[in-house]
Amino acid sequence: MESLIQTYLPNVYKMGWAGQAGWGTAIYLTLYMTVLSFIIGGFLGLVAGLFLVLTAPGGVLENKVVFWILDKITSIFRAVPFIILLAVLSPFSHLIVGTSIGPNAAIVPLSFAVFAFFARQVQVVLAELDGGVIEAAQASGATFWDIVGVYLSEGLPDLIRVTTVTLISLVGETAMAGAVGAGGIGNVAIAYGFNRYNHDVTILATIIIILIIFAIQFLGDFLTKKLSHKS
């Protein structure tokens, strides 16, 4: 097997598994940036999406000022292409993590991108829930946190679905960040593949990204179906 790789994928073989330019390191950095960015941006996006619904006209906590601010912040970050967001937030990344390059620096703009995208997805999901369920909870004297629980439990299957979409989008943005210095599979594909005309490296990097996305999609579909059947 090793001899076959060495013969037909010589550049892939030369890179090895470990080390700064190894495949294992690249995969780890891609997953590291994806997971950490989603934890940070996903949490903020969930909270923002929830409050976009709660403070909207006719919402449980109707508040035009809060809704307007959240709506505009989300729209601004959604409107800026990610490659530009990387450049714009570079000074902020340096302020937060002490550097403007590398995986830790990339997590800052990635988190902002996830926040805006996921907030809109959550808003759409929760806004489409049956209003009668929320009204029934209010009529029974439910507290604020009880109502939040109703929103999240009723919308859980669709929240899993939009989480899947967000993660898939994030993997692509992580690869884009890698191409401009953050490391990971994107960096391997461009720096060690495309720029050096090592087509086997570029192709394998692409296949790895596709496999990661397929894995996320499979898990997301599985959880969505399972939770939908329970509900």
Where are these regions (language model features)?
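Periplasmic/extracellular loop-to-transmembrane helix junction in inner-membrane transport proteins
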Residues: 1-37, 63-68, 151
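Transmembrane alpha-helix signature in integral membrane proteins
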Residues: 23-54, 163
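Loop-to-helix entry region at the N-terminal start of transmembrane alpha-helices
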Residues: 25-33, 75-78, 82-117, 201, ...
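Cytoplasmic-entry segments and transmembrane alpha-helices of multi-pass inner-membrane transporters
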Residues: 51-89, 110, 117-124
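C-terminal transmembrane helix and the adjacent membrane-cytosol boundary/short C-terminal tail
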Residues: 51-57, 203-231
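Short helix-to-coil transition segments within interhelical loops
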Residues: 126-155, 195
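Transmembrane alpha-helices
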Residues: 144-176
